[in-house]
Amino acid sequence: VSGGVNVMTAQYIGAKKDKDVREVVHSAAWMCALMGVILLLFGQVFSKLILEVMKTKEELIDGAALYLRIYFLGMPALGIYNFGNAVFSAVGDTKKPVYILAFSGVVNILLNLFFVIVCRLSVAGVAIASVTSQYMSAVLIMIALMKADERIRFSPKYLKLYPDKAKDLFKLGFPAGIQNAIFQFANLFVQVGVNSFDAVIVEGNSAATNADALVYDVMAAFY
C-alpha cells in the first residue's frame, strides 16, 4: 500500500489536486493501520505453526515463537511508519523519515541493553525493545505529518476510507507487495535448509542475514 501512496500522492500534487491528495493520504493511513492489525492477528495465531513448518530446532522453537508473537505486535506501527515515509518521500522530503528512524534505532539499541542486561528478559526483551521503537517511530512520523505542509497534512477529521482512492492504492501497491512476498517466500526455503543444521549455525545465519539486509538497504537508497 505504501508504494501506491508514494505514486498517487506525487501524481496529485503535480496535478495540483489538493482534495485528491488529502483523500489519498487519509485512505492510506486507514489501510496501512488495518493491514498492520491483520498481520498482528496472523502472527499471534500462526507464529509457532510457521516455525514448525520451517523445521526449527526444538530447543529454539519456544523462544522463537515468543519473539515472533511479541514482534508481530508492532505491525500496526510499522504500517503507519511506512505510510508516513511514503507520503514525505512523495513531496521530496526523505530526511525527516530517516531522522525519525535513526532516533528510534538508537532507542531500540538502548532498550535492548536495558531489557536484556538489566531486566534479563532475553529473547522477550529484544522483541519488546523492537516493538517499542516501532511505535515510537510511528508516533513521531504522525506528529510530523500533523505539522506538515497543508497538502499532505494529516487530520483525524478527514480519516476515512475513500473507496475510489483505496481501490487505486490497492491496484498500485499490490504488485509491489507480491514482488516482495515472492522474494521472502524463496528465502523461507533457504531458512528451512539452514534449520537442518545445529542451533549455533542457525544463530550465525541469522546474524549474517541482518548484515546482508543492512548492505541491501544502503544500496537501495541509490535506486
Feature-to-residue mapping (PLM):
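Hydrophobic faces of transmembrane alpha-helices in multi-pass small-molecule transporters and flippases
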Residues: 68, 72, 95-102, 140-143, ...
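Alpha-helical transmembrane segments of multi-pass membrane transporters/permeases
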Residues: 32, 87-111, 124, 128-131, ...
